[in-house]
């Protein structure tokens, strides 16, 4: 298993992501040939040193006096390139993110009429196709991105003077739920193309997940900054054969809340995306009876779940323990047939394996077994035992 973590401490652009992926081990010649066959560009790859850090630098050369393309023209170019299906889907998805962001910012609901400006040139097309091809070739099981340094100040572009991050970039970050922060450099450090590529491939994380570094890559940016203008990427190998997952733990103490309210909150949190909910009795100061509410959640869901807890319980705050690293088995739901007293029934079982396919556990789905118990008159405990017995023979 491999995990890729982008660490954009100096921002990110399309060419930086492409260069970083190449520096991590993607086939330089294969990606170069693909890019040059798919867009009217030439691609140069060279090593540079940015403030003491060696990095790969990718330069895309485009035809002079190139016209600004519309979104439909970009789509037609991508489809005409006859890319592999997975690569075409990624490329189209990334450009759709940029188109929807531009449309939202400029109040243009019809994407067919949308004109790209900075991202409508052939270099953006090359960056997206090249980055997608390189990242797919790394064959990572998961991709994460730490908070992105977006820079600060203002920029001059086709729409005039805009704040940093540019409105379209900010919209991409909002929809992609990526973490970001301002920086001390008075410059745009995150481009719309960079934001769209990262939001397509990566999930947000506040810190590096646990693992062993097996490769480190740096993609160089064009500008010279006070610090190294590079995008860092790290390939990690998890320390366990279990699958890694990034979670946050939300916790609060609640007193003067009825059991009915807590029961409703339990169901509401699960329906809103909580991975698990636990409510435990506790004793607070002065001997007051209370409950500890603990929720396991994906980082992108934490804010809405915390708000729900506060609204429903009247709690004055929720503790968030961020970026906890969870190791878990890969779990699949399989349907099997079992025979009971001459009758055949179908039921679901949960099959857990590690990353190498070793069987860790099998558990019968209670609701299915409950229905079979009612239909057959056999105790549900016996149904579950027989179901798991059959499943072990099938999946061991």
Swiss-Prot record:
Q: Which Pfam families match?
A: Ni_insertion
Query: Which Gene Ontology MF annotations are present?
Result: lyase activity; nickel cation binding
Q: Does the keyword Kinase apply?
A: no
Q: Does the keyword Ion transport apply?
A: no
Q: Which InterPro entries match?
A: Ni_insertion
- What span is annotated as the signal peptide, if there is one? none
Q: Which UniProt keywords apply?
A: Nickel
Stated family: Belongs to the LarC family.
Q: What is this protein called?
A: Putative nickel insertion protein
**Species name for this entry?**
Methanosarcina acetivorans (strain ATCC 35395 / DSM 2834 / JCM 12185 / C2A)
């Amino acid at each position: 298993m491999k995990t890729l973590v982008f660490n954009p401490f100096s921002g990110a652009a399309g060419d930086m992501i492409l260069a970083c992926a190449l520096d991590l081990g993607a086939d330089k010649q294969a990606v170069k040939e693909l890019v040059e066959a798919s867009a009217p560009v030439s691609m140069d790859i060279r090593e540079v040193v940015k403030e003491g850090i060696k990095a790969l630098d990718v330069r895309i050369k485009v035809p002079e006096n190139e016209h600004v393309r519309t979104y439909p023209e970009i789509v037609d170019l991508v489809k005409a390139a006859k890319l592999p299906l997975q690569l075409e889907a990624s490329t189209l998805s990334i450009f759709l993110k940029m188109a929807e962001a531009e449309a939202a910012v400029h109040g243009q609901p019809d994407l067919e009429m949308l004109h790209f400006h900075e991202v409508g040139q052939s270099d953006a097309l090359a960056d997206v196709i090249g980055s997608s091809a390189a990242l797919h070739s790394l064959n990572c099981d998961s991709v994460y991105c730490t908070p992105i340094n977006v820079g600060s100040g203002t920029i001059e572009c086709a729409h005039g003077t805009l704040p940093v991050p540019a409105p379209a970039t900010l919209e991409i970050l909002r929809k992609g739920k990526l973490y970001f922060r301002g920086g001390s450099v008075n410059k745009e450090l995150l481009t719309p193309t960079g934001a769209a590529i990262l939001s397509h491939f990566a999930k947000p994380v506040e810190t590096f997940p646990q693992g062993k570094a097996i490769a480190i890559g740096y993609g160089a940016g064009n500008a010279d900054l006070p610090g190294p203008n590079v995008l860092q990427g790290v390939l990690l190998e998890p320390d366990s054969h279990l699958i890694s997952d990034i979670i946050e733990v939300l916790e609060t103490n609640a007193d003067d809340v009825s059991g009915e309210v807590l029961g409703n909150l339990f169901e509401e949190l699960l329906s809103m995306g909580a991975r698990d909910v636990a409510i435990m009795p506790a004793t607070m100061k002065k001997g007051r009876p209370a409950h500890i509410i603990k929720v396991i959640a994906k980082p992108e869901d934490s804010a809405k779940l915390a708000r729900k807890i506060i609204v429903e319980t009247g709690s004055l705050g929720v503790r968030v323990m961020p970026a906890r690293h969870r190791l878990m088995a890969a779990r699949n739901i399989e349907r099997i047939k079992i025979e009971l007293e001459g009758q055949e029934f179908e039921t679901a079982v949960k099959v857990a394996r590690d990353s190498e396919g070793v069987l860790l556990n099998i558990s019968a789905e209670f609701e299915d077994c409950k229905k079979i118990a009612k239909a057959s008159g056999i105790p549900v405990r016996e149904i579950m035992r027989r179901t798991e017995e059959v499943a072990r023979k099938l999946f061991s």
